[in-house]
Amino acid sequence: MLFALLLSVALTLAGCASPRLPVTPTSVPLNAGNVNLVFVISEDLDYNASADIDANTANLTGQGLHRSLLMASFLKKSILGNNNVNGIYALEPMTHLQTASNYPDMVPLQTIQQFAMLNKDTLQFNPAGATLYTAKSFHINVSYAVGQTISGVAPPLFNCESCQGIDFSNQGGDNNSLLSDLVKEDVPGYYVFSAPWETTLNMMTVLNQTNGYNLSLPSSYSGPKKIYAITITPSGGASLATYDSNITPQSTYPGLTPEPSVSASCEATPFHYSASPAKPPVTNTNETLYLIRHAEAHPVPSWENGNYVAQGQWRALALPQALRGKISPDQVYSIDPAQAGASGYFDWSYVRPSLTIEPYAIANNLPYRLVSDFQLNDVSTVTQNTIDFFFNDPQFSNHKILLGWEHLHFPPLVSALLKSYGSSQTAPAWASGDYDSIWTIRLDSAGNLTVDNSICEGIDSAKLPDTAPQF
């Protein structure tokens, strides 16, 4: 998709206290030989373009999502010159809660996800490092800094220093340390940050003052079309570039071309379990929980970067259409993407589940929340935590919830529920190549339990393109 490009660059060399220079239109991408710190301004309730943010959910609207998809292409082509990114850093969602309902800020992560799909990770996946794998997506760093504590958020199972994200309020100066380390490491390339205006301005200001760059930084919010870059030469000189994407998104949820075909039939072997004890072991009633697995992961064993691949972006963006008429949740949940995982050779932020169902929440204007108690690789504890969270809390009675998560946790959850109801039935394994199934757990008015897989997304992984959609 074509859109006009306008790039204005204001240069102020480090060590020079020059006044603001005239804006000169240009279309020159950043120099790959410099350390380029690129700041993408995500929108929030305080700083946004008209109709990009839903005031009730503090999430993107269809228009805001379309802007992020268009922005990714502009960022890749016009700012990076189609070069590959070195690092992507997004706001830790639970550090910025909005509205009286305290919704986490998923906008920075969603804003930069399409850009991550346009870049590639190339990393080792064996101990000797002789074998490299190039993925059709890039990882996003969004995990908590070492020692960082967030009110109401469970501490991570392990700290991931290499996948630190951005803290909205810069707790402990962690954002400053992140930028300072990148400058000190002095590895040429492109480092992209996605955060709200308040946080971004603070990051640029501290970097400017600490290093004595004397750059003439913007003093006020100029809208989501602007992208700022501080570029540092090998000699240590710095300059500021201000880019204007001139993007005009459509006002509705973005369509896909081609639109993935959706089938009414499901491939998984059907099952149906029910249990009706005299006294149900859980307290909730009239509740439905839809379990959906994250979108397509990397197909190579023992290699992981926490994100999904290009096919997954097609699936995630197609979910609103694929699920229309099949499910009817009134709220959406996923695990906190700031929780980290490890493949043995590479640590990563686990963004895949939350980003899979984010477009569905956007398209349907649904409340979106994150849970930090459901962590990776801790099945026994997680199973009971999940049961207590969703089925022993009255806030979920009389509601339908969509949960995007990790497929290995679903069978233990269902089996534990059945066992608690006195049933000897156990859930089947969820096939490793199955990204399409939906497991539905229902409690009726008396608390009786049924579980089945009678519906599915209807999207065939094999028919999805292996390159990301273009906008």
Where are these regions (language model features)?
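Active-site-proximal alpha-helix that buttresses catalytic centers in soluble enzyme cores
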Residues: L21-S180, D186-P188, T200, M204-P394, ...
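C-terminal active-site subregion of NodB/CE4 polysaccharide deacetylases
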Residues: S397-H399
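Sec-dependent signal peptide recognition
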Residues: M1-L7
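C-terminal motif of bacterial Sec signal peptides marking the signal peptidase cleavage site
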Residues: L13-G15
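Cysteine-clustered segments with highest specificity for TGF-beta superfamily mature ligands
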Residues: Y190-F193, L402
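Bacterial signal peptide processing site
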Residues: A17-P19
